Amino acid sequence: MAALKFTKMEGIGNDYIYIDSTQANIRLTPEQIQKISNRNFGIGSDGVIFIRNSKQGDFMMDMYNSDGSSSEMCGNGIRCVAKYIYDHGLTNSKNPKIETGAGVLEVDLKIGSGNKVDFVSVNMGKPILVPSKIPVNWKDEEAIIDQTFEIAGKNLKFTAVSMGNPHCVIFVDDCDQFPVTGIGPLIERHPIFPKRINVEFVTVRGKDHFYQRTWERGAGETLACGTGACAVTVAGNLTGKSGKEVKIDLRGGTLRIQWQESGNVLMTGPAKEIFSGEIEV
């Protein structure tokens, strides 16, 4: 393959390599994705997102984790896709529809100086709480809210939520003191999660204010996870720890999440372009 043009972008530290595939059907093997995502020998990222044409929406995001595995969707990633298509002149709409592996999502662009996108609000749709649809191998189809399971000798309470991708939300006393990198991969690959799972460790900082660390399926600990923040908001409300409008601090920045009366979850946060370049793959 000739030199591959790319743009690196980040949403509160959740960084991906974005490849404009609207003019050519560009595809990479899992090994190539691993190579360019490597932080020592490649560009360095949490994964790769291809921006493609869509028959269902205005554009499609085709997402892969840094280990080369595919993923349905990324909340921070979709904000960056929205910024890319507007800032690079692929659309002049401030409300484009973007197809993801979790369905077509509507975004609302907040334009700043230089006619560039600063913030993006995304209607993330309704949370899924039915165990078999998350999926979780569970004893019944009742929502899994504050249920206990054992991992590495610890009894942990978790709430299971899908925002188009699966999340296990666990509230702990102090995220920074919790062994996220030790426990996270054990939960990710626990047999009750047949497609593996993203894990959120959450500490209550105040009224409707959480601090979140995320162990992402296929990527390890990341600085942020937008779908995870949405799942945390839902779990916080279902467990009586918060209302439906929540401020969530992550290691890379802050997101505002609202679980609306319609049942949809609205996520608002920044999106930034870091640099563009070419790489041999």
Swiss-Prot record:
Reaction catalysis annotation: (2S,6S)-2,6-diaminopimelate = meso-2,6-diaminopimelate
Domain of life: Bacteria
Enzyme class: isomerase
Site (Could be important to modulate the pK values of the two catalytic cysteine residues): H167, E216
Residues noted as binding substrate in the record, renumbered to the chain: N14, N65, G75, N76, N165, N198, E216, R217, G226, T227
GO molecular function annotations of the record: diaminopimelate epimerase activity
Residues at the catalytic site: C74 (proton donor), C225 (proton acceptor)
Pfam family, one: DAP_epimerase
Keyword Amino-acid biosynthesis: yes
Cystine pairs: none
EC number of the protein: 5.1.1.7
Annotated pathway: Amino-acid biosynthesis; L-lysine biosynthesis via DAP pathway; DL-2,6-diaminopimelate from LL-2,6-diaminopimelate: step 1/1
Subcellular location: Cytoplasm
GO annotation terms (biological process): lysine biosynthetic process via diaminopimelate
GO cellular component labels: cytosol
Keywords: Amino-acid biosynthesis, Cytoplasm, Isomerase, Lysine biosynthesis
Electron transport listed as a keyword: no
Subunit annotation: Homodimer.
HAMAP family: DAP_epimerase
Function (record text): Catalyzes the stereoinversion of LL-2,6-diaminopimelate (L,L-DAP) to meso-diaminopimelate (meso-DAP), a precursor of L-lysine and an essential component of the bacterial peptidoglycan.
Family the entry assigns: Belongs to the diaminopimelate epimerase family.
UniProt name for this protein: Diaminopimelate epimerase
Gene label: dapF
